[in-house]
Curated annotation (Swiss-Prot):
Encoding gene (name): ATP4
Residues forming coiled coils: none
Annotated membrane topology: Multi-pass membrane protein
GO molecular function: proton-transporting ATP synthase activity, rotational mechanism
Name the record gives this protein: ATP synthase subunit 4, mitochondrial
Membrane-spanning residues: 27-47, 52-72
Quaternary state and interactors: F-type ATP synthases have 2 components, the catalytic core F(1) and the membrane-embedded component F(0), linked together by a central stalk and a peripheral stalk. The central stalk, also called rotor shaft, is often seen as part of F(1). The peripheral stalk is seen as part of F(0). F(0) contains the membrane channel next to the rotor. F-type ATP synthases form dimers but each monomer functions independently in ATP generation.
Keywords of this entry: ATP synthesis, CF(0), Hydrogen ion transport, Ion transport, Membrane, Mitochondrion, Mitochondrion inner membrane, Transmembrane, Transmembrane helix, Transport
Similarity comment: family membership: Belongs to the eukaryotic ATPase B chain family.
Job description of the protein: Mitochondrial membrane ATP synthase (F(1)F(0) ATP synthase or Complex V) produces ATP from ADP in the presence of a proton gradient across the membrane which is generated by electron transport complexes of the respiratory chain. F-type ATP synthases consist of two structural domains, F(1) - containing the extramembraneous catalytic core, and F(0) - containing the membrane proton channel, linked together by a central stalk and a peripheral stalk.
Length: 204
């Protein structure tokens, strides 16, 4: 298989993020990444199987909403156009057939022959009506399937956004809680003092 261009993959990831502009999307991505790295490095959040499963699920939902839904929508549209074309062609053929039979019947003088011709025409008309009804049913089924898929895609997008908001809220709450911890504050202060002393030592 042909390897996917990293630039294309990066653009697809950024497009899947919420936001109206490239700057807002990259800002969300950078903020999320920074918060995640800080939480993991400070042991506020431990990466486990549930985290990996959540990331995989979100990626799968993003892939489905970006690839499968547009493909199915285009396929359903093409199928609907094809069926509508068949219906129009069947109607035109039926009209032409009726006109031809009427012309033929008008030239007949034998009552028996005329009756037989009308009977054959009625059978053909019934068959064409049955075919037209079947095609209409197929169009209705295709439209219903597309409507269901569109609803499912919207629902999955809402679920994904809600889960992202919950995850961000949880991480932020843990970070804020840890920042209010006296031991953590002392640890940060000690690290800052140590860094300053190290810089002064280098200057000497």
């Amino acid at each position: 298989s042909t390897p996917v261009d990293p630039k294309t993959k990066a653009n697809a990831l950024i497009d899947s993020l919420p936001g109206n502009s490239f700057l807002s999307k990259t800002g969300i991505l950078a903020t999320t990444a920074a918060a995640s790295v800080y939480a993991i490095s400070s042991e506020l959040y431990v990466v486990n199987d549930e985290s990996i499963l959540l990331v995989t699920f979100l990626g799968f939902i993003a892939l489905i909403s970006k690839t499968v839904a547009p493909l199915y929508g285009e396929m359903a549209k093409n199928r609907t156009d094809h069926v509508v074309g068949l219906l129009n062609q069947a109607r035109a053929d039926h009209v032409n057939a009726v006109k031809t039979r009427i012309d033929q019947v008008s030239n007949l003088k034998d009552v028996v022959s005329t009756t037989k011709a009308l009977f054959e025409m009625s059978k053909e008309t019934a068959a064409l009506e049955a075919e037209a009804f079947e095609l209409k049913q197929k169009v209705a089924v295709a439209s219903e399937a597309k409507s269901v898929l569109d609803s499912w895609v919207r629902y999955e997008a809402q679920v994904r956004q809600h889960e992202q908001e919950q995850l961000a809220s949880t991480v932020i709450s843990k970070v804020q809680s840890e920042l209010q911890n006296a031991k953590f504050q002392d640890k940060v202060l000690a690290q800052a003092v140590e860094e300053v002393e190290r810089l002064f030592a280098k200057e000497k």
